[in-house]
């Protein structure tokens, strides 16, 4: 798999790249590195999404953790941000989530959180990875009464939902909301959350069967939700991904409201209420240029990081900001959470609409979005490596940047979670960015597809 840890934990095709043997080793190494041998029975909370392979990997992780004396608290099917929250709630040393987020069901992944609920920094991931690859953990295997045990957390869903409810001061009674659970982790919590907050819920795609997670539904396939909201005359629609750390929305007219729009709406509201720390918002290099102009117009500072909510969070912690996110819907309300949380984002947005007595369609006009295209080019692991040294590709990218000038931009990057080269072109002239982006994609295919 190359380097084990990408931008969002370990990820790969289950039982091919991400095997039970590897998962067991990761469990052992995580327990040893994160507790540094200071506790006889360190406690780990362990959650999973709805993929067919999640049960298998759960068993392997449990075996690895218990074999070095860790106590494992099983949370069952639950969201990634729930794991991050419950680490602290249950006074655990660390948390682990089994999920491949927005990827198809055949993929799976392992995300690790420290005791304070934050994703691990690169340095700790490197330590775990080194231990896994060198296999040095076997001499420290526990025996006798030192072997770890497993506990089931029967109230995990309730505890997490109560936490989310505590973040909103208003009832959502009377609001008509469609909720697309993506046949993923939100299937375990969304209906309970929105119903208890008083909303009239239309719960969609909440029947996971192990293989239908993210399948033509959720935040990566918004078309059916857009149609549903418009057809049924609802106030808003919200959609999550497989592990519910993302949220995208649909307004009352059936139009898509992506992460940049959600951030613009929420950031301005927070600023006007004196709740936006240092009047600043953190985004990424992929954040739409229209959002950056929006921040300038409203005297808000904008900070851009590398792609990945972990990097957004790092900047927030470094500069003591409390709000940031990504166009993809990873949005971090740091006053309430340590990571992106789709369901938290949804109820914060709905609460804002209730407080302002506004329709989402009217608030979406606050920001003018620049035309933007995204092209994904599938490549092998070797192709991803070759991308960095291919001078022909680099020359074509530089040519594209020159053509777009100051009125647009192009970003070409290797995906940290999938076997893809991602191309984003943006500017005022849609025809131009389509032409420029397509040319770069064609060159990448020509140069890397055979690698």
Predicted segments, located by residue:
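N-terminal small/polar loop signature for handling phosphorylated ligands or for N-terminal nucleophile
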Residues: 32, 40-108, 192-250
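Gly/Ser/Thr-rich active-site loops/lids in small-molecule metabolic enzymes
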Residues: 121, 203-204, 255-274, 342-351, ...
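An N-terminal, well-structured beta->alpha segment
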Residues: 1-63, 67-68, 146, 150-177, ...
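Proline/glycine-rich low-complexity loops and linkers
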Residues: 126-161, 166, 252-325, 332
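Short glycine-rich phosphate-binding loop at a beta-alpha junction
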Residues: 39-49, 73, 176-179, 279-285, ...
